[in-house]
Amino acid sequence: MILMLPSMFHANAWGFPYSGWMSGADMVMPGPHLQGPHLRTMIESARPTLTAMVPTLLGDLLLADETAPLDLSCFRAIVSGGSAVPSSMIEAVRDRWNVPVIQGWGMTETSPMCVLSHPPKDLNGETETYWRLKSGRPVPGIEVRVMDDEGNLLEQDGATVGELQLKGAWVTGSYLNEETDAFTEDGWLRTGDVGMVDERGYVQLTDRTKDVIKSGGEWISSVDLEDVLLKHESVAEVAVVAVDDTRWQERPLAIVRSKSGCDGEALPGELRSFLVDKVAKFWVPEYWAVVDDIPKTSVGKMDKKLLREAVAAGKLAIQKHLGFGEGND
């Protein structure tokens, strides 16, 4: 039984209405109400065995469980996509309910699934979470390659980063009545996603091309920064965007929604200290904004376009912190 939580208009609900029908699975449709209490009632009464949701909604369920215990042990797996699932979320779902989180990557143009994350039988000395954090391997029929800005093919070594491009029988080759540079001359779809592919064929997304931050000629992944920040006990949500900087061209701005009871004034300094031994030092943001809410798109992703517009319009109270663990500079 599938609990259908992706929006019906989001990449054809990730293909679940079709795969569910083809496999003969029952489907539970939640309607427009995706709040915690309504989902709790549906899960407890229907006891579905599979569901899919964006990380934002999965985070809401984890928070609901902290208020009143929620039993998700009925699920054999939870599929998540739309944006990267933080490692803290993957581990929390496993530790609380012994349920694996399976990441997927795709888009409407790929009908919609192209990559699915299942750890290999041989973990190669890594943890299971390490493999679940990856976007996964291409599903049969899909090819993936990594290209640089000049159109050169890059190595699949798990380290070299470039634009991910796709090709396959169900990958679209054009847009109706629209001229676009989204396709290469040799027929590959330019996804606009930045990432790498390792020797085993596992794809790892690091950012969207429009979201990656170039500071002093070096790339900073907003996705990776967000993943580390979410491990801090005081952070409920975080979005990282670029802001202009006279010396470095761009620097990361961390926009944080803290958990209740936290000191918003002291939090940026605490988070800088938290980051300093977990990421490269030049990745540590000096620009911070602590907010009551982070806007979402209609499919539950952080609305970074709206956040960038808010920054440009001066609507965010941005603090600059250069010290660690204390005060503004």
Language-model features: locations:
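Conserved AMP-binding/adenylation subdomain of ANL enzymes
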Residues: 1-5, 9-49, 64
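Gly/Ser/Thr-rich phosphate-binding loop
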Residues: 22-25, 48-53, 62-130, 143, ...
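AMP-binding/adenylate-forming catalytic core of the ANL superfamily
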Residues: 51, 168, 173-174, 194-283, ...
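Active-site glycine-centered loops adjacent to acidic/histidine catalytic or metal-binding residues
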Residues: 82, 106, 136, 193, ...
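Conserved ATP/PPi-binding loop(s) of AMP-dependent carboxylate-activating enzymes
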Residues: 134-141, 152-185, 218-220
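Conserved beta-loop-beta connector loops within the AMP-binding
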Residues: 141-165, 199-200, 262-268, 303
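AMP-binding/adenylate-forming catalytic domain of the ANL superfamily
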Residues: 277-302, 320-327
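Acidic/polar alpha-helix N-cap and adjacent early helical turns
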Residues: 309-329
